[in-house]
UniProtKB/Swiss-Prot annotation:
Lineage of source species: Eukaryota, Metazoa, Chordata, Craniata, Vertebrata
Protein name as catalogued: Necdin
Keyword DNA-binding annotated: yes
GO molecular function per UniProt: DNA binding; gamma-tubulin binding; promoter-specific chromatin binding
Gene: Ndn
Known partners and oligomeric status: Binds to the transactivation domains of E2F1 and p53. Binds also SV40 large T antigen and adenovirus E1A. Interacts with nucleobindin 1 and 2.
One Pfam family hit: MAGE
Species for this entry: Mus musculus
Superkingdom of origin organism: Eukaryota
Amino acid sequence: MSEQSKDLSDPNFAAEVPDCEMQDSDAVPVGIPPPASLAANLAGPPCAPEGPMAAQQASPPPEERIEDVDPKILQQAAEEGRAHQPQSPARPIPAPPAPAQLVQKAHELMWYVLVKDQKRMVLWFPDMVKEVMGSYKKWCRSILRRTSVILARVFGLHLRLTNLHTMEFALVKALSPEELDRVALNNRMPMTGLLLMILSLIYVKGRGAREGAVWNVLRILGLRPWKKHSTFGDVRKIITEEFVQQNYLKYQRVPHIEPPEYEFFWGSRANREITKMQIMEFLARVFKKDPQAWPSRYREALEQARALREANLAAQAPRSSVSED
């Protein structure tokens, strides 16, 4: 059997994932013993003694063989026995979960996979079922596909089946090594997706993004401002302190507004290390759209890419002239 890795986002993958449904085998019904009415019919009518000495000389009547009994009597007795047999209640068929429940499970599996990958632990399918899916095992294919799509769009990762025999999975980085080195944030890959999501929102807004708008987007990923997360911990502290201290974000109060509101801007380090075209590619991957779906932002990204290319050519020109001399 080939152990070639397979992407879960591939629609052909569904045919290769083992069936997640568990088939329960019902007990085979056993034969029904003949009821008392059948024994009475087989015994026949009692024989009355004849004469004064008949009681002593009478012998018991010969037993009637079952082959000599009218088949209608047997059928009637069997139906009577089935009528008195207690019937086991039918097992209710579970209703399929709502799409929102499958999405929630997909988010739970996404964070589970990210944590396992950070700890350099093997991703086994049975562990996913036991620790995350639980009673949703019948819908494991749908949950795996949704999880793979979220990982690819948000974090630039692919969830691949690396060994079909042992059902071992692995996370494969979809971004190029140069892009990963530029925004890896000390090799904490989940942080990359979190940062790119916020920077993308700021870029689409044009100048800055209010804190409320940022949290509306992060809630889609299951992140809450005042709730500890299994992967990130204190998410609010990360985006308002860590990213700010690393100069990836600016976090400023909006003037002349009560109660106080805050907004995010690109930091100096983000402007140096992350290009607008990379943000456009990230948005296209997340929303499954062409970058030209944001025409003004796409033109701006093209202009920046052209300017960077010209600057690189200008920087290389003196070196080439010196080498020729």
